[in-house]
Design a protein with these regions (language model features):
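Active-site hotspot residues in diverse enzymes, especially metal/ion-binding acidic/histidine motifs
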Residues: 1-374
Length: 374
């Protein structure tokens, strides 16, 4: 009896037109352009109808057009030839987000592009980062969200004190943290790529570190809490989880007591300094835990708004937030000669000289002997 049916033909490699079609579509969306917008940016060299045909894989471009497209879309030419990979699963954007469709698509395309480069870098180094879910039960109530934060801290052995570097903490535990330039209305989103949990954060959050920390943990909530898709309080549950991760209940009681009639702003400023949580989130936490009466919370919130603190809060948090894993892997791949400097620049999606400067790498002319001289 023949067993020939057990041998599978290798999957056909996608042809250039198909790869180019996907990559052009991705690069256009990442640039925040419609087909007509790209046609205009190309000064009418190519019509939007022709661009549509390229994106459908019906036509292949010549080298002149490739170079022009790369320039207009601010991406290296070889990005159009990069092998296709699985797409990010359903990306969880904030419900009721006021993000325009074009800006949302741009954020998705940039995230997809970045995570593909990240995974390619890991594969070059033969690394498979282990991620295991820190909790394994559905979250249905605010009490569940508090418990979940407690359990995540316990499973990840984080103790009860302030979390020093949230982004590094997530990366050390197998969560890919991706930073993208995005619309000011976009803070973050989360998704899965195969078994890889991915958190995407806007680079404008660097101007507000407590908000960056809170957003990262809010997105972790979407990944680990197992909230039903149609749960009406999904966003609030993730908020509660993030606040409990930053400032655990026991620490709140220890710092400010279990019952208060009022709280002074300097008290919250010192909490912000220690725990890296914003005044707004700390105040909300006191309401959540029923430490402050609802009426007092509302009065303090009015004060907060009147002072203009929703635009610029008093108090600062000096802790550092940096997800350095991608750059560390890039330097490791360079040191082990797994990649050339130009490949590193393509993976980092930045010009070669900019990468050389950012990572403080020696220039092409420098040699060990030159470096050794005083």
């Amino acid at each position: 009896m023949s067993h020939s049916h057990t041998y599978l033909e290798p999957a056909p490699r996608p042809d250039f037109k198909e790869v180019f079609a996907t990559r052009l579509h991705q690069a256009r969306e990442a640039a925040g352009l419609t087909l007509r917008g790209l046609a205009e940016a190309l000064d009418g060299q190519v019509s939007h109808t022709a661009l549509n045909k390229y994106e459908k894989g019906l036509m292949a471009p010549d080298s002149r057009l490739l170079i022009t497209l790369a320039k207009v879309l601010s991406c290296p030419v070889d990005q159009f030839f990069r092998p296709l990979r699985p797409s990010l699963g359903a990306i969880r954007f904030r419900k009721k987000s006021s993000l325009r469709e074009l800006a949302r698509k741009a954020a998705e395309a940039r995230a997809q592009d970045h995570v593909e480069r990240y995974i390619e870098l890991e594969e070059l180094l033969a690394l498979a980062p282990a991620y295991s879910a820190p909790i394994n039960r559905p979250c249905q109530s605010f009490a569940d969200a508090e418990d979940a934060a407690r359990q995540v801290r316990q499973t990840w052995q984080l103790g009860h004190g302030p979390l020093p570097n949230v982004l590094e903490l997530l990366e050390e535990r197998g969560v890919k943290v991706i930073r993208i330039d995005a619309d000011e209305k976009f803070d973050g989103c989360s998704a899965w790529l195969d078994q890889h949990p991915v958190i995407v954060l806007a680079s404008h959050l660097d101007r507000n570190i407590p908000k960056l920390r809170f957003t990262a943990l809010h997105e972790l909530g979407h990944l680990v809490l197992g909230i039903a898709e149609d749960h009406p309080d999904e966003e609030k549950l993730c908020h509660r989880f993030a606040a409990a991760m930053l400032w655990p209940q026991e620490q709140v009681y220890q710092s400010l007591g279990r019952q208060r009639q009022n709280v002074m702003w300097p008290e919250l400023v010192s909490i912000k300094r220690e725990y890296g949580i914003s005044l707004a989130a700390a105040l909300y936490r006191l309401k959540d835990l029923a430490i402050l009466p609802e009426s007092k919370y509302r009065w303090l919130q009015i004060q907060y708004k009147q002072q203009g603190w929703h635009r610029n809060e008093p108090g600062s948090y000096a802790g550092e937030e940096a997800g350095l894993r991608f750059d560390q892997l890039l330097m490791r791949a360079l040191a082990e000669e797994k990649i050339t400097l130009s490949k590193a620049a393509a993976l980092a999606h930045e010009p070669l000289e900019a990468l050389r400067h950012r990572l403080a790498l020696p220039g092409p002319a420098s040699t060990a002997t030159e470096d050794a001289q005083p």
